[in-house]
Amino acid sequence: FLAKKVAKTVAKQAAKQGAKYVVNKQME
């Protein structure tokens, strides 16, 4: 089902953003 695929893509993007946020926090 398409919605499931979209949800998975969104989750992957969110994880990528979250990882970037964590790295930026550790850099400070």
Curated annotation (Swiss-Prot):
Task: State the UniProt keywords alphabetically.
Answer: Amidation, Secreted, Toxin
Its recorded name reads Short cationic peptide-1a
What cellular-component terms does GO give this entry?
A: extracellular region
Single GO MF annotation: toxin activity
GO BP term, example: defense response to bacterium
What species does this protein belong to? Answer: Cupiennius salei
Q: What is the superkingdom listed in this entry's lineage? A: Eukaryota
Name positions with the PTM Glutamic acid 1-amide: E28
| Location(s) in or outside the cell | Secreted
Q: In which tissues is it expressed?
A: Expressed by the venom gland.
A Pfam short name: Cu
| Keyword set includes Secreted | yes
* Family per record: Belongs to the cationic peptide 04 (cupiennin) family. 01 subfamily.
Q: Output the lineage of the source organism.
A: Eukaryota, Metazoa, Ecdysozoa, Arthropoda, Chelicerata
